[in-house]
Amino acid sequence: MKLRLILAAVIAAMLPLSLSAQDDNSKEQTSKEKKEIIKTGYNLGPLPAVAFDADKGFQLGALLNIYDFGDGSTYPNPRQHWYFEASFFTKGSQLFVISYDNKTLIPGIRWSSAITLTNDKAMDFYGFNGYRAHYNHDAVALGKDKQNPDNFIYTPKYRVNRIALLAKTDFVGNIWDKKLFWEAGYHFSYFKQGYENKQALNLAKINKNKDPEKVFPETEEPIFDLYRKWGIISEDEAWGGINSTVRLGLLYDTRDKEGAPSRGIWAEGHLMLAPKWLGTTNPYYRYSLTFRHYVPIIKNDVLTFAYRLNYEGTFGNKAPYYVLPYITTVGQSYDRDGMGGYRTIRGIMRNRVQGLDMASYNVELRWRFVNFSLWNQNIAFGLNVFSDGTMVTKEYDMSFKGDEKYRAEYDAYMAEGLDKDRPHITLGGGLRFIMNQNFIVAFEYGMPVSKFSKDPMIKNQDGNGAFYINTGFLF
């Protein structure tokens, strides 16, 4: 009883408002497999968005989930789902999201659409090809040391301003036995990098209110500006552009449920076609392969082993740099950037690993240590341990194409990195609050293995680790 009171207090603090529009009879239904309330009708979850991401800072804002479970026959999967979010981060980012997913409006077709706007005043940019691009961890650490005021804040060295507008509409239809599906969609995106005065950052804003000795000097160029000067990033694509993309794919899905699966396979293969004639500024053609597997060790969602394998590839040897840090999605989700960060490789710095081709994995052991019903809601708490990893398998061209007077500094920079990338691996764990199998709040911490490496070329190259408060499962 005491434990339940404590948990009730925690839930009340985390979920200040949860509304359900359904009849009284539906509240009494329970599933045969385990005691669980079958949700019907509309379930609304307006919440303050208070979270933390080591890459973006504290998040303040609001979000709204609307789930339509209809007569309950599809529970725990909703018939349709709306999601709205407006968030502001203390490190200078803003995020606005509207997404909609519907399984019944078009007979036999799942329709998903989303529009997102991200404004990053100082987005992480560490260069290309993983460990080939050296990260000066010591200078960053000294700049943050309040006991050593003689070193300026070095973090802007690895930042660039970016505005990203993404819109998409996807359709998924059955091919065989509601397990094999076709996928097709149109994705539009607009990226604006840097500023019109041709530099990565607005240093006046970056240095505002800083002590004079901590000001990032104008003579210290960010990596993004150095890459332009050396010709690694061409002026034709440096400042962003438009992507007009058709996505085609196949999906194999045998999951028992979508929000928090405990058994089944979820595998996808996608083609991304962005030709010039469709309006793309810098045309490219890419592909993506993803395999996810959920293995029940103890039934009824108690203990689950889950893993994801992903490969993001490029046809040919050219793709605009601003499309590289994404794991491709088609369907109810939407693209999120950062090979490194909560949605990709937990524990390493956001966008740390970028290349034309990248392989990654995520492995988790998920344990739900308590399940109960409270206030007509299905509540669960879970723990997980994980390991994530990624590596560049086809490099972005980092050859020198600039003015010869800059070659010496380019050679010195390249000499600091490795001759090729190696696996970036992290370990970590976390706690999850799960309501009605769909609304999930996650608290996780990831630590890069490179932090403990004895090789000075690798040690601390992925950062110090990161703590996240976010929503959902990674996969």
Predicted segments, located by residue:
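Outer-membrane beta-barrel "beta-signal"
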Residues: 433, 438, 461-475
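C-terminal outer-membrane beta-barrel translocator/porin domains of Gram-negative envelope proteins
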Residues: 236, 246-249, 257-377, 393-395, ...
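Short loop/turn motifs that connect adjacent beta-strands in outer-membrane beta-barrel proteins
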Residues: 31-42, 70-79, 105-111, 174-182, ...
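Transmembrane beta-barrel strands of outer-membrane/channel proteins
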Residues: 50-52, 62-66, 82-88, 113-121, ...
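Outer-membrane beta-barrel initiation region
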Residues: 22-106, 112, 193-194, 203, ...
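Transmembrane beta-strand segments of outer-membrane beta-barrel domains in Gram-negative
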Residues: 32-33, 114-116, 123-300
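Outer-membrane beta-barrel translocator/channel fold
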Residues: 73, 86-165, 310-339, 454-458
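Residues that define the transmembrane beta-barrel architecture of outer-membrane proteins
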Residues: 42-44, 56-60, 78-80, 92-96, ...
